[in-house]
Amino acid sequence: MFNAEFFPTPAWLTEEMLSLVNLRSVHSILEPSAGKGDIIEVIRSKMHRPRIYCCEIDPELQMILNGKGVTILNDDFLSFTAQGYYFDLVVMNPPFSQGVQHLLHAWNIISEGEILCLLNAETIRNPYSEERQLLTKLIADSGQVQFYPRAFADAERQTPVDVALVHLRKVQVACHFDFMEGLKQQAQ
């Protein structure tokens, strides 16, 4: 069944993820590792005509997504630049072996918005690498994490792994210009 890291997100867990955001304020959504569209289907059930885009590297899964009318922007999310696109919500369950890279890449390509990401819980609990330490700091500065033991134990594709739901919020920093200070500097 597809690749070794294909673990479709259970609907109940997607519901938990989406409960952390106000979907009424969301305009454009990216699902970077869409699989066969399980997360997308739950989003579609909660929103009227959402603008959802995705990336998916597996050609067979791409065919399934095409059949569901999902817009695929790129195959490999880690090479996706998002140039010309704006996403205010990224929802993902990336391959566990690349979870940190996917989450950090998502953070880098959005200018403002929220990210909901499922990771292997060990990614958070054991920050042995520089990337994991960076992620730990990012969560401390801009987000939160919730742990779900054995969340995929009864899923379509089962695994006893504990997962971490990371919720990050990126706020665009406004440029502040003091007009009076600018005039004072010009006068000098």
Question: Where do the language-model regions lie?
Answer:
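Class I S-adenosyl-L-methionine-dependent methyltransferase catalytic core
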Residues: M1-Q188
